[in-house]
């Protein structure tokens, strides 16, 4: 009887330690998340002619249409900080799942000599041009992906897109109404900013 009570006490102590340690891990994760929030919300006034940063913008995902397994959409970025900045080229995209894990992406910048697709918006099919954006101005880019799996490929569910405007720059986060499911190793066709 005494041995049974001792084993029961050890078991209850183990359960209590396990339960408390799980809560401590969750608390650490929450603290880590809130630490990154102030960094992404910092904005500064920029003199004219400097490169745009993701932190200068608010993003909106524009649901598109699909045809023959190819889904088309666009993203509108609105400059929310004072001053003006310049932008030229293609966005750098990162896809995340519902837990925030980064998903594989295989971007193809269009237009290119390698062919590819034509976006429904004619501006998206033009080469990159230099854009100067003041507070309240908008810029867009188009994207497309196949939602039809081939062979043994997986179609991941991306619920968040981080858009980086320049290499090493900050990002703006965009959340689509419906998850993106790019198949074929995360192949996403991307237009330049227009």
Regions found by a protein language model. Give the residues of each.
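Extracellular mucin-like PTS domains
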Residues: 25-46
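Low-complexity, acidic Ser/Thr/Pro/Gly-rich terminal tails and inter-domain linkers that flank the onset
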Residues: 44-67
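Short, solvent-exposed loop/turn segments enriched in Ser/Thr/Gly
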Residues: 67-74, 154-159
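Acidic, serine/threonine- and proline-rich intrinsically disordered appendage/tail regions
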Residues: 152, 171-194
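Short, surface-exposed ligand- or partner-binding patches at beta-edge/loop junctions that are enriched
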Residues: 139, 147-171
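The feature marks short-to-medium sequence segments in extracytoplasmic or secretory-pathway proteins
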Residues: 88-133
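Asparagine-centered strand-capping/turn motif at beta-strand->loop junctions
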Residues: 75-82
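Short Pro-Gly-centered flexible turn/kink motifs
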Residues: 130-144
């Amino acid at each position: 009887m005494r041995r049974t009570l001792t084993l029961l006490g050890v078991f209850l102590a183990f359960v209590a330690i396990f339960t408390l340690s799980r809560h401590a891990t969750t608390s650490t994760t929450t603290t880590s998340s809130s630490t990154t929030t102030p960094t992404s919300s910092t904005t500064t006034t920029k003199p004219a002619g400097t490169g745009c940063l993701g932190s200068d913008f608010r993003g909106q995902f524009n649901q598109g249409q699909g045809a023959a397994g190819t889904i088309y959409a666009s993203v509108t970025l609105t400059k929310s900080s004072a001053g003006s900045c310049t932008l030229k080229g293609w966005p750098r995209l990162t896809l995340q799942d519902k837990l925030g894990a980064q998903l594989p992406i295989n971007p193809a910048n269009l237009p290119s000599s390698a062919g590819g697709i034509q976006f429904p918006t004619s501006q998206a099919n033009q080469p990159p041009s230099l854009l100067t954006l003041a507070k309240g101005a908008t810029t867009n880019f188009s994207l497309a992906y196949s939602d039809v799996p081939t062979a043994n490929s997986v179609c991941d569910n991306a619920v968040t897109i981080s858009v980086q405007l320049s290499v090493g720059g900050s990002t703006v986060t965009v959340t689509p109404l419906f998850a993106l499911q790019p198949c074929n190793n995360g192949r996403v066709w991307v237009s330049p900013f227009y």
